[in-house]
């Protein structure tokens, strides 16, 4: 019973015949031919099912008649046996034993009668089923009548089409050759379709490789950022170190200036002494050799300092070269990104060309013949599905491209900002280096002048200690206390009475100096030790700077990971909240009915775009949609407003009967 019922098509509603006639009138000829062929096949299936059902009905009716006849015969036999047994008991009461023996047979007969009654009830059930089948057959007959009417119309259309076909045959006798050409073209198109499938696979592989390249470029850019950050930190540390060195040099310069002032004050006194002891300069010539050796040592130390300055300048040049290298790397990364964009554009153009080729092939196949169309329907469906998947992939690629473009723009802005900061820092570093060079030159000049002054002072001391002048006593008597001394010119010789003389010093004190001597200068060994200490401090600062930069990069990566996890968790929480609200809204049956009406109103072709926009707001409130889903609904409403009626009728063909 279930097999024929499943093959029966649903009965159309009573008001669908007029609407069906209008639809048939509006359909084109090719669609009418297809519809008529489908209806003929459906009617043939219905006839086959009807003949099988009629045969089954006849067989079951014959079985029922036999069962009824057997039941009537059994009833007659039972009545005869009961009457005979009653007569025998009345006539011969001694023959009860025989009656008892026959009562067993009667009981068996009663059982058989009960079984036959059950069979009769079953036959009644079968008769009810037969009535149901008859009602279904009536419904099928009605459906057949409707379909025969549609077939008559279709046959009329077919006759018209046959007439037109005959006319076309009379006009065109070379259709066979064209059909052969079309078959050849179809074979060629199938080959082209296979080639295009291969090309689409190649395009997918290229797209995957492009995605891998984009990922590699993003990794390279991240590594370049880390390198730039490290170089920035190193340049900052170098600037700080240079600033500290400048501060140290400034402090030393201030000390030297203070000493210079002291030396200048002492030089004034030494010049006065030198005027007194000009003639006592013999031992100075012997000590000039030693002093020249000391000056040579000082010059060598100055050359060492010059070498250190050149090394610092080389380091600054290296930093500049590294900066230029980073700028070139950024330019190369930009070129690579532009190349990727060009490849994506080429892929898009190729995809559009392939879609155009598909559409042209589909049009040619549809115009070729109905048989080829039926064969190629499945292939077209597959191609459409592949095209949809390709479009979805293209959309995903476009979204990824937009993301990559956004990231590239951000990275370009960051790189530009970093380059600007690097340029400013480099300019400041160069300025500091120039200022340091100037200060070093000034310090060298001051050092040389102080050396000369100290040498002259020591020479004067040596002359004063070794060759003392004879003391000239005044010819006139000692003046009284209130006597004023006349002014003496500076060129005149000064006597012992004019100024207080210093105590006499030995030659060893003058040559080697005393421990408490004010004119003693710091040794060069101490300055070298200070320079080594400063270099060690610089190396330690570089190491700490490198370590801090690595810690900063690790912290930045961890921070980025935490931000992504935080955003994902927030999105998941929002989605769960929307799901809970949606379940609370849809738990009520009234809301479900309201939502069904909203969907039906949204899908009606008669609705205005403004109404659809309002319905989108209602759906957003009831279903608690996300912003992306709202945008999708708005895009669908806009597409429904701009699309043709024929393009949407295929998607919503089953809604016409439901809406009524």
Swiss-Prot record:
Any Pfam family hit: Rab_bind
Could you tell me which residue ranges the GRIP domain spans? 585-636
Region (Disordered) residue ranges read 1-28
Keyword flag Hydrolase: no
Matching entries from InterPro entries are given as: GCC2_Rab_bind, Golgi-autophagy_related, GRIP_dom
- May I have one GO cellular component term? Golgi apparatus
Question: Residues of the signal sequence?
Answer: none
Does Flavoprotein count among this protein's keywords? no
Identify the keywords attached in UniProt to this record, alphabetized.
Answer: Coiled coil
Query: Where are the annotated coiled coils located?
Result: 30-92, 115-464, 517-596
Q: Tell me the PANTHER family matching this sequence.
A: GRIP AND COILED-COIL DOMAIN-CONTAINING PROTEIN 1, GRIP AND COILED-COIL DOMAIN-CONTAINING PROTEIN 2
What's the protein name?
A: GRIP and coiled-coil domain-containing protein 2
| Species this chain originates from | Caenorhabditis elegans
Source organism phylogeny: Eukaryota, Metazoa, Ecdysozoa, Nematoda, Chromadorea
Which gene specifies this protein's sequence?
gcc-2
């Amino acid at each position: 019973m279930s097999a024929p019922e499943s093959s029966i098509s649903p009965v159309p509603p009573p008001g669908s015949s007029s609407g069906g006639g209008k639809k048939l009138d509006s359909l084109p000829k090719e669609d009418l031919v297809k519809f008529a062929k489908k209806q003929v096949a459906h009617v043939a299936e219905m006839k086959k099912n009807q003949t099988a059902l009629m045969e089954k009905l006849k067989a079951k009716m014959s079985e029922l008649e036999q069962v009824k006849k057997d039941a009537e015969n059994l009833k007659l036999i039972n009545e005869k046996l009961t009457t005979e047994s009653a007569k025998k008991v009345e006539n011969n009461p001694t023959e009860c034993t025989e009656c008892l023996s026959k009562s067993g047979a009667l009981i068996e007969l009663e059982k058989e009668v009960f079984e036959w009654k059950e069979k009769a009830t079953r036959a009644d059930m079968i008769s009810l089923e037969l009535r149901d089948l008859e009602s279904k057959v009536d419904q099928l007959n009605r459906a057949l009548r409707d379909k025969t009417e549609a077939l008559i119309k279709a046959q009329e259309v077919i006759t018209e089409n046959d007439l037109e076909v005959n006319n076309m045959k009379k006009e065109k006798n070379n259709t066979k050759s064209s059909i052969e050409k079309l078959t050849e073209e179809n074979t060629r198109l199938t080959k082209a379709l296979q080639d295009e499938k291969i090309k689409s696979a190649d395009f997918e592989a290229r797209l995957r490789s492009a995605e891998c390249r984009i990922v590699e470029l993003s990794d390279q850019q991240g590594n370049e950022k880390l390198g730039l950050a490290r170089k920035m930190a190193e340049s900052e540390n170098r600037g700080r170190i240079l600033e500290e060195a400048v501060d140290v040099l400034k402090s030393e310069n201030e000390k030297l200036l203070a000493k210079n002032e002291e030396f200048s004050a002492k030089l004034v006194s030494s010049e006065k002494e030198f005027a007194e002891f000009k003639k006592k300069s013999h031992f100075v010539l012997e000590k000039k050799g030693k002093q020249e050796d000391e000056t040579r040592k000082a010059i060598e130390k100055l050359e060492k300092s010059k070498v250190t300055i050149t090394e610092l300048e080389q380091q600054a040049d290296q930093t500049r070269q590294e900066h230029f290298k980073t700028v070139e790397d950024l330019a190369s990364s930009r070129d690579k990104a532009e190349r990727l964009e060009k490849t994506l554009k080429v892929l898009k153009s190729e995809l559009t060309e392939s879609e155009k080729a598909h559409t042209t092939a589909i049009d040619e196949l549809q115009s070729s013949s109905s048989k080829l169309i039926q064969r190629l329907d499945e292939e077209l469906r597959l191609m459409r599905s592949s095209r949809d998947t390709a479009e979805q992939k293209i959309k995903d690629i476009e979204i990824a491209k937009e993301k990559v473009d956004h990231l590239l723009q951000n990275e370009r802005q960051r790189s530009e900002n970093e380059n600007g900061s690097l340029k400013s820092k480099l300019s400041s570093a160069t300025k500091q280096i120039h200022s340091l060079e100037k200060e070093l030159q000034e310090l060298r000049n001051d050092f040389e002048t102080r050396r000369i002054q100290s040498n002259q002072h020591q020479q004067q001391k040596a002359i004063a200690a070794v060759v003392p002048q004879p003391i000239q006593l005044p010819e006139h008597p000692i003046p009284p206390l209130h006597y004023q001394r006349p002014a003496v010119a500076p060129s005149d010789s000064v006597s012992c009475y004019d100024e207080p003389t210093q105590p006499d010093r030995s030659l060893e004190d003058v040559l080697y100096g005393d421990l408490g001597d004010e004119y003693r200068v710091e040794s060069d060994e101490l300055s070298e030790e200070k320079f080594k200490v400063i270099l060690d401090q610089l190396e330690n600062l570089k190491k700490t700077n490198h370590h801090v930069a690595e810690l900063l990069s690790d912290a930045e990566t961890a921070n980025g990971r935490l931000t992504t996890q935080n955003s994902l968790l927030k999105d998941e929480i929002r989605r769960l909240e929307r799901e809970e609200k949606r379940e609370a809204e849809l738990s009520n049956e009234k809301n479900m009915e309201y939502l069904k009406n909203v969907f039906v109103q949204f899908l009606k072709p008669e609705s205005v775009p403004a109404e659809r926009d309002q319905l989108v707001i209602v759906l957003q409130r009831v279903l608690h949609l996300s912003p992306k889903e709202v945008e999708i609904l708005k895009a669908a409403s806009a597409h429904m407003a701009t699309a043709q009626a024929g393009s949407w009728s295929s998607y919503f063909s089953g809604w016409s009967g439901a809406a009524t």
